[in-house]
Amino acid sequence: AETLKNKIPVPKKVPVTFGDVTDDLLKGVDILSGDTLMLELANYYRPHYSIFIMDYPGVFDGDPADSNSRIYPLVNSDIATKLRDQSHASQTIDVTGGLIGKIECALEMSKVSETWITNLGALSGFFDGKTSGSRVLI
């Protein structure tokens, strides 16, 4: 059986798994977000696709557990502002930037790469040209 590993030559893919605690010349120790790593790699390699994988199949307009919530098929700066305002209202803290940090990096990445936010189940479709999730455009 052909796997994703066999379909794409290693030099053509750059997996990014997660951020980590790192040394920082100014701060001593800091968090290096996996989203920031993706942004830097996308700016350098300029891939066709940049795909953020998360637990949900895209960016939702509300709580993903709520059956009334829907996926935004397109996330732009207006949607990002709306979600940022909602995030500030909930006062949830995530040192890695959470969804808002991911969207902000994705917006920048969309200048150099077709950028998506989706889940692991949708990933293989991208290799066959079947995109799904939330497309991010600046």
Predicted segments with their positions:
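C-terminal catalytic "cap/lid" subdomain
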Residues: 1-138
